[in-house]
Structure formats: C-alpha cells, structure tokens
C-alpha cells in the first residue's frame, strides 16, 4: 500500500481515537442544539447537519434540537401580502403574523428537518411549543411595540425527556402560549437557552453563520465572562453578537455545563467541536 493511501487512513484513525474519550464522557448526556442561519438554507449543509445530529444520537448523546426559520417566515408572509417589521432584531408579530409563524415554523420548516434526519437514519419527532404545554410563555416586556412576541415562562421537561428516553430527537419549533391560550412568537436563541436550563443540559450549542468570537484574524477557542465584558466595552463584540454572548453566560449561570458557538457553514463543525481537542468554534467558560 502506498504512503499516499496510508496517510489519510492514519489521519482518519487518529480522529476516531481522539473522539473515543468524548463519546464515553457524553454518553447519556443531553445536548441542546440551536439550529439556524445558512446551515438551514443550503442543501449540502442541511444534509451534513442531519448526518452529524444522527451520529451524535447513535453514540448515545441525547439531542434536543431547537430551530429558527426567519427567512422562511418572511417569504411566506410576502406571498400572503404581509410585511415583516423588526424592532431590536425581533419580528413584530400581530394576529396575522403569528398565524404565518405557526404555519411555517411548526409546519413546513419543522417537518422538513424531521424528514431530513429520518433520511439519514435518525429518529426525530416534530414538536411545536404548543404540544403538551412544551413551552408556556408570557408577553415580552416590550409587547406594546412587538405585539405577540413572548418570553419563556415554563418548559415541560417531562415530555421532552419522555421523547429522548424513547431514543427520539425532539425537533422543537419555538412558539408558545399563555394560560389564556394566547399564542406567542419566541426567539429561537432564547427558547434554546431556556430549554437547556430546564433540562439541566450538558451543553448548549449555537449553530450560526459565524465561526465563533473573533478578535482580529483569530477565532477565540474559549472566552470567559470577564474577557467578554472587556471585548464588549472595547467594541470588538458588538451588534447582534452582544445578546448572544449575554445569553450564553446567562445559560451557564442557569446550570448548563458549557455553551458553544460554531459555524454551520464549516464542514462537520458540530462533530469537530464536540469530539476533538482543538474544536472549531468558541466555548464559553466560567
């Protein structure tokens, strides 16, 4: 056998050996994955993500998937003649828009993800936040401007655990309702954070369009709360990244072991972040 053939085989073997202690460590643990961005739009990336999630479940990690779908909601709204408006990055949601969100997010987007995981050998089940009181919500503090945008009040962990114990991957659409039956649009990042805290998850992983926290040309492998505060003060962490960073540390304060931010456009980033020493994104640490 030529050295050209031996080299890649040896590299593959080394990756598998490196993964083994992580597989042992995380068997039976719960990972909440927030799925969004470009990884939801490109067919190659969608298939790769579904493969990665299926593999994680096959090696014994309990996966709970929370997804976004903002672009799909906007497209559906446009077809129905509805204009999308945003305040501080949140979609203004009236009764017409909440119907579009429920139809699109809990309908087509959710079922497409379930189908894709199934095609790659996984067993997924679509869950609307309305199912079995999965997500109870209350109005956002800025409801006067935002309308039917909600914040998570309570998670039905018994239902999610029941699905996970059956070997299924719950795929959760972040909509919720209150005790009066009012429906709410819930930010997917916020929903993923609340679900991971409620489940006492080992990890929360944000699959996004950025490679991690970047300083100059370097992606930080880890970042502490003090380091993040300094980078925010210096303007290096800015814009939409600030609430994501704040949410990550709030999630850890709530008892979640680790929070990761990875690039969904990078090849097999989910597996590499979890099963290799170096990782590929940024890990938030206490």
Curated annotation (Swiss-Prot):
The gene is argB. One of its GO terms (molecular function) is ATP binding. Catalyzes the ATP-dependent phosphorylation of N-acetyl-L-glutamate. HAMAP family: ArgB. This is Acetylglutamate kinase. It is found in: Cytoplasm. Its EC number is 2.7.2.8. It is an enzyme of class 2 (transferase). Belongs to the acetylglutamate kinase family. ArgB subfamily. GO terms for biological process: arginine biosynthetic process via ornithine; L-arginine biosynthetic process. The record marks 34, 244 as: Transition state stabilizer. One of its GO terms (cellular component) is cytoplasm. Substrate binds at residues 69-70, 91, 185. It holds the Pfam family AA_kinase.
């Amino acid at each position: 056998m030529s050295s050209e053939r031996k080299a890649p085989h040896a590299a593959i073997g080394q990756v598998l050996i490196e993964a083994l202690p992580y597989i042992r460590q995380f068997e039976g643990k719960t990972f909440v994955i927030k799925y969004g961005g470009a990884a939801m739009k490109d067919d190659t990336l969608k298939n790769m993500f579904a493969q990665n999630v299926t593999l994680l479940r096959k090696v014994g990690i309990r996966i709970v998937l929370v997804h976004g779908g903002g672009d799909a909601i906007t497209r559906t709204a446009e077809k129905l003649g509805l204009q999308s408006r945003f305040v501080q990055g949140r979609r203004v949601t009236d009764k017409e828009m909440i119907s579009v969100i429920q139809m699109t997010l809990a309908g087509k987007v959710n079922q497409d993800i379930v189908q894709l995981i199934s095609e790659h050998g996984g067993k997924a089940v679509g869950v609307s936040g309305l199912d079995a009181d999965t997500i109870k919500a209350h109005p956002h503090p800025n409801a006067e401007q935002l309308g039917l945008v909600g914040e998570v009040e309570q998670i039905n962990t018994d239902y999610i655990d029941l699905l996970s114990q059956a070997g299924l991957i719950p795929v959760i659409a972040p909509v919720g309702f209150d005790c009066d039956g009012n429906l709410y649009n819930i930010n997917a990042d916020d929903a993923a954070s609340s679900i991971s805290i409620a489940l006492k998850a080992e990890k929360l992983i944000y699959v996004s369009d950025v490679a991690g926290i970047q300083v100059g040309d370097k992606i930080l492998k880890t970042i502490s709360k003090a380091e993040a505060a300094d980078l925010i003060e210096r303007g290096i962490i800015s814009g939409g990244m600030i609430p994501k960073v704040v949410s990550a540390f709030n999630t850890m304060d709530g008892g979640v072991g680790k929070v990761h931010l990875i690039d969904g456009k990078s090849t097999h980033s989910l597996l590499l972040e979890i099963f290799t020493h170096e990782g590929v994104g940024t890990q938030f640490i206490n």
